[in-house]
Amino acid sequence: MRTFILAAAVAAALTRAAFGENPPADPAAPAPAPVNETVVVSATQSSEIETEIPGNVTVVTGDELRRRNVHTLADALEDVVGIDTGIGSDNGVQVPTVGMWGLKEFDALLFMVDGVPVGGPFNPNLSQINVDDIDRIEIVKGPQGTLYGVSGFAGMVQIFTRTSEKGSHVTLTGGSFQHGRLDATTNVPLGTGSLRLFGTFDRTDGWQDRTDGRDDRGGIRFDQALGGGHFSAVFNAIRTTQLWGSPLPVDPPTGEVIPGFRVDRNYAVDGARQDHRVFSLTTGFDKSLSTAVTLVNTLSYAHDDQISVRSFVDPGSVEDGTVASSGVSLKPTEEALFEDFHILANFQGAGSHRLVAGAALTWGRTVAAGTGFDFTVGLDPIDVPALGDIPVGDHRSFNDRRTFFGIYVNDEWNPLPWLEITAGARHDWVEEELFAKGQEVGDPEAGVSRDSRSDAQWSGGLSGLFRLVGDKSGALNEANIYVAAKSAFKPAAPNLTEAESAEILKPERTRSGEIGVKTRWLDRQLSFNLSFFHMIFENLVVSTLGADGNPALVNAGKERFQGMEIQAGYRPNVLPDIELIGGYAHHDARYVDFTFIDPDEGLLDASGQRLELTPRDLWNVKLAWLPASGPGAWTAVRHQNHRPFDKINEAYMPSFYEWDAGVSWSFSAHARLSFVGRNLGDNRHYVAESEIGDAQLYVAPPRRFLGELTLSF
């Protein structure tokens, strides 16, 4: 870390000597946001210009998503530089797994909506995210434990939803695989406040056999001036019925598809599904006590009744055109309560300070009961039995309760006009109690697992931002160098489907260093950002085969993630409706110290090997021309090089390109017609690996088209 700090200090000194000093007149007075600059909240819990943040931050606007007909979280994030994602995961055919810095673990990232973690203290519940209601997405890379606690220990994605606005909007969508969608929103003045009503109805047959989906969601948002401050309340109701599709079994030594299996065929039990019935209420209140101090409070409760039925084949059991399969049917109920209270304060003391201090509580409970079952699948032709026709093999249940409480403080100090030092610390208390039971049919005794764990640990961060060139006209308008060091921890998530074998694993911890430069050129028409990162991850939870041949979650010792990311954007002043954005990322993600026992091959050492399914090099380019009226068009291309298939890197998956494009016509401020094609090259690459089914991968959806008509009045 001293190397990072020394490099930043030397670079700052040399560059300031070359360009000369150009400090702002008054460091205590916040500068207004420059033209074409993005304001970010997530990185510091207060409004900050992106170039003034000592870290890698990207913002995607909801208007941009709607103009590109985006309705899934994967489509919303896939063109962000360095983000590795795709549609499909253990949690459903429409639910992605998202990777940053080469880390693609489902629970490694914090996902928030309006300041509230979706899923509470458990794994991110991405089905709760309403993509149609997004105002903007803020992606902050690297550990965020200081401000956001144990869930933000490797990076975060925060979604801010739309507030009250004038008028009403209706969008009709139709496309491939019998996809139909209706989205409507209206805004109603209510005294001195405002009321916003919104709803979405979505139907699709799915591209994989027996993966029909129905997604109905709606809500109410109320905003009101109250007690000299601002109060908001958002109620959401979600009813998602998603038939579940199985991943594709692959041979570990070669990476080839197991003979007899085919892409887009569904080998899961007939009746497999991932359903959610969610009710949530989030309230927010902020009040300025003075020009220098503001109070902010967020309170949320969510209740999710689920139906989870999944099954996975045993690739090694293929014989005479059949394969053995096992599955679990559960009805979990998940509750989550979240409360955060903090103050924002600006004051003087050897320079200007912006202080954030507060406390947060996250509580959650998941209770479930269900059955396990075994059956046989016919491969050619496919013959899959219905869930109700399969004998019950065992009964299982679990009760998992988690409580996180943390106090935190973070200070941005400007001792000099050209220097900002940010330091923060957080202390978290974590408690978890787990009870799981399983009983085989015919066995008079049940297997019981009781486990509990308490931890109290610190997270923190220290960073410096050096303003080399500040808000000048001409060729180089702004140049900032930053260096940051951060550390965070989180409790590991048990695999609750393992019944009596479920256990609480060791907490995971990250330590990272980052150095970067952010520049603006040609009167802010051109942006160029460059960052280097290094992160050590201890006790990463991975899936391996247990002694019984079934997948099990284990701690994986130590991993190292390092690399660099470049992002450039160009928006000419003479053609402000045209935007060109591109970037390149180099991610080197490796096991540092990890050995495990394979039931067939014995002790294996993955130390020094790359993490499976993580690309070393990935790049993307997007060109858009989207004027407010008249014709518009856009296209986006992304690429990933070959990726290791297994933990000891015996086989690699081929590199791939993916291409999307769309055209539109805005007839006026009241009507817009658009057509979009995704994965136009029909590349069926792998997007994620199952953490439950051994050596089984989810495949990218095929070429598909979408037409959309939006009416505003």
Feature locations, PLM:
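Membrane-embedded beta-barrel scaffold of Gram-negative outer-membrane proteins
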Residues: 184, 284-288, 292-312, 467-473, ...
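Short acidic/polar hinge/loop motifs at secondary-structure boundaries
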Residues: 116-141, 159-161, 253, 257-259
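C-terminal beta-signal and adjacent terminal beta-strands/loops
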Residues: 639-646, 664-713
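N-terminal periplasmic accessory domains that precede
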Residues: 73-76, 96-99, 112, 127, ...
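Transmembrane beta-barrel wall of Gram-negative outer-membrane proteins
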Residues: 174-203, 208-247, 271-294, 583
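Extracytoplasmic beta-strand/coil segments of soluble accessory domains associated
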Residues: 42, 46, 74, 78-116
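Gram-negative outer-membrane beta-barrel transporters
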Residues: 417-421, 525, 532-536, 554-647, ...
